[in-house]
């Protein structure tokens, strides 16, 4: 296990943002079910990408890893061998997409994955697939891994919960591929930008659908065309670097490169929100330029950029006014319960933060170095790293291996911008800073 030891730091300079995980995984999946050869440049290298590649190879896709791109020849006949076992690793997208994909086949397919996936909900997607005729059997408790899917689904109509956008994204993929027609309505749609990203891919690859309000219809039997695509930078990952730059004491700007302002990624909206709150952020060509600046807090609807909750919580600790992050129910079902995880860890640093109904209440307060835990969640680990860079005293963050999920070179990127972050194995020990209780007694919070 790895740990980060972080000293107070200011950053500036220029850095390339890692490729988008959301685009990478969708591109690999769609190239693998296309009839022909596609090329994906600048794909993210991560455990989730590898889980998607391995699952797609079981479909019969031929995937070659070249020096700067993936060359993928899709399976000519969409099928799986009998009794196939798909291991989704820790990837929510692989988990949901292949659960839905398995339902289009007559062969039984078993879906399994890491212990972390056990806490990721799947029941709403399963209910929708059952309404189309799929059946499920479980090794343990219902709606938990591992389970076996038996199809094929047949034409019809269903509803699917919108609490997590991946349910609708997975269903859209299955309904496009299976023999239709199909239609479904998203009930109480959340995380809308991420479902829109899936629809963007369907449109780019000539996979037809129609929309009426929150109801989507698919003719079925549609395979994507082949394509050549360059994955742009990940706005979700860029948010951590942008936050570090905003809080920096440096008078010099930080350039975040490979970010296209026309990209369909949902977390791009976070940057526009920060601008409205007063942050000095500008888009220029394919870069985002960030200057150290003050910004206000506010009442912030988290649904459009739910993955940004941990780093926004950190930023709100340094805002000029209190903040209420609301409509964040989806953050409870990610790699960790992010509402609880970020609260527990920032409180160790002295933050005045508390959970409220599906959200957070945060009063600005100074932060102090502490010993913290990532909760095995990449976004918690990176958010705490930014907090630690702007705290008084050194901090240590345990179990940071998870950061490789989306930002494999996170430490290298920070240190290239003059941060003071060291990566160590877990035998490193250090005296933690004062506990939150001590800080409360001293009147800091």
UniProtKB/Swiss-Prot annotation:
UniProt KW keywords: Amino-acid biosynthesis, Aromatic amino acid biosynthesis, Cytoplasm, Transferase
GO cellular component, one term: cytoplasm
Enzyme class (EC, first level): transferase
Catalysed conversion reaction: 3-phosphoshikimate + phosphoenolpyruvate = 5-O-(1-carboxyvinyl)-3-phosphoshikimate + phosphate
Annotated active site: 307
SUPFAM superfamilies assigned to the protein according to its UniProt record, in alphabetical order: EPT/RTPC-like (SSF55205)
Residue positions binding phosphoenolpyruvate: 21, 92, 120, 166, 338, 379, 405
InterPro entries for this protein: Enolpyruvate_Tfrase_dom (IPR001986), Enolpyruvate_Tfrase_sf (IPR036968), EPSP_synthase (IPR006264), EPSP_synthase_CS (IPR023193), RNA3'P_cycl/enolpyr_Trfase_a/b (IPR013792)
Binding positions for 3-phosphoshikimate per the UniProt entry: 21-22, 26, 165-166, 307, 334
Superkingdom of the organism of origin: Bacteria
Signal peptide coordinates: none
Keyword Signal attributed: no
Record localization: Cytoplasm
GO biological process: amino acid biosynthetic process; aromatic amino acid family biosynthetic process; chorismate biosynthetic process
Subunit structure: Monomer.
Functional note: Catalyzes the transfer of the enolpyruvyl moiety of phosphoenolpyruvate (PEP) to the 5-hydroxyl of shikimate-3-phosphate (S3P) to produce enolpyruvyl shikimate-3-phosphate and inorganic phosphate.
UniProt xrefs under PANTHER family: AROM/DEHYDROQUINATE SYNTHASE (PTHR21090), PENTAFUNCTIONAL AROM POLYPEPTIDE (PTHR21090:SF5)
Family membership: Belongs to the EPSP synthase family.
Protein name: 3-phosphoshikimate 1-carboxyvinyltransferase
Source species of the chain: Chlamydia felis (strain Fe/C-56)
